[in-house]
Amino acid sequence: MKNESLVKEPNILTFVTTYKCTSACNNCCFQCSPKRNLTLSREQMLDYIEQVTRDFPSVKVLVLTGGECTILKYLPEIIDVASHKYGLAVRIVSNAHWARTYDSARKKVAELKAAGLNEINFSTGDEHLEFVPIEYIKNAIIASVEEGFVPYVNVESIESHDFNSTYFTKDEELSTLLDENKFKVSNGIWIDLKNPEAMMKKPDKGIHCSNQRCDNIFSGLVITPDNRLKACCGITSGRVKYLDLGNPAKIPLHTLYDKQFDDFVKIWLHTDGALKILEFIAKYDKRIKIEEFEHLHQCLICTMILNSEKLLGIIKEHYDEVYANIIMKYNLI
């Protein structure tokens, strides 16, 4: 029987609205591209919003991402209903493909603002720039600021990449806006999802989050275009079957969400993080050298553990050694 005291209520609903994108980044976490058409319908999203606001009053934010959510003609309606009918703060994540000119950018941002949008985030970096020029991002930032937003720009980053957030400090117009706190920018972690072994051989010394606990899991409800509820929206979650909680079109969201609290591994990830779990596993698998993992992103370590029957088997066999301590720490978070 479930120990209901372990359940942590989510605060964010995320729709991966579509796998279709104007771009086809080589290491997209959901492998999106113009060739993929699977999309959450208007009716599906509205139904999920109604369910979530009824059954999860703790949820206050709706995030619309993809793929590229702005290609959906009914996006303004989804924003309008979520914002004005259900009182959710709504955020979108976009590659700004629509910001070819300042005027086109201003028109799009104004439309989204009128619908009830609260926050707008942009993604860029080496792979994004193959499809969306940095000038588009600049247009989108300026247009968003003019419409009263404080946009957030996430830059895919790794030591070997050419483009990073310093661009925004060197551009005269953008640096002024940045100094005035009119928009925000950060270097987001990038992972070579198609060749993770290469990252293990040459780890990025700029990564210092490997030893952190996972605060993504248990924080939200993530629904994908194929009607799957995910345990998190981490950058490798689309490649980890273990994090698939089920089909919310067939089983109520609350049932699927609550069931994950029967899983000690997920509780442990939330409490200690993937690296600490790997350190425990390494006691029983001497081939694992922890120093080789200290500069890998925690999502990559998590993926390695959750996709390995052998490593999960070690946890299953020995978890009772740490169970009481982890549950105590978990309840203090």
Question: Where do the PLM segments sit?
Answer:
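Conserved alpha-helical substructure of the radical SAM core
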Residues: M1-N95, A99-A110, A114, E119, ...
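Flexible mid-to-C-terminal extensions adjoining Fe-S/redox cofactors in radical SAM and related proteins
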Residues: R239-I333
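Short cysteine clusters
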Residues: C21, C25-C28, C214, C232, ...
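Radical SAM enzyme [4Fe-4S]-AdoMet core and its adjacent flexible, acidic
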Residues: A110-T255, K259, L312
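Processing junctions and N-termini across compartments
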Residues: F15, Y19-T22, H208, F293-L296
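Extracellular structured ligand-interaction cores
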Residues: I12, F218-G220, L296-C299
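Short, intrinsically disordered, charge-biased short linear motifs at domain edges
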Residues: E9-V16, E197-P203, E279-E292
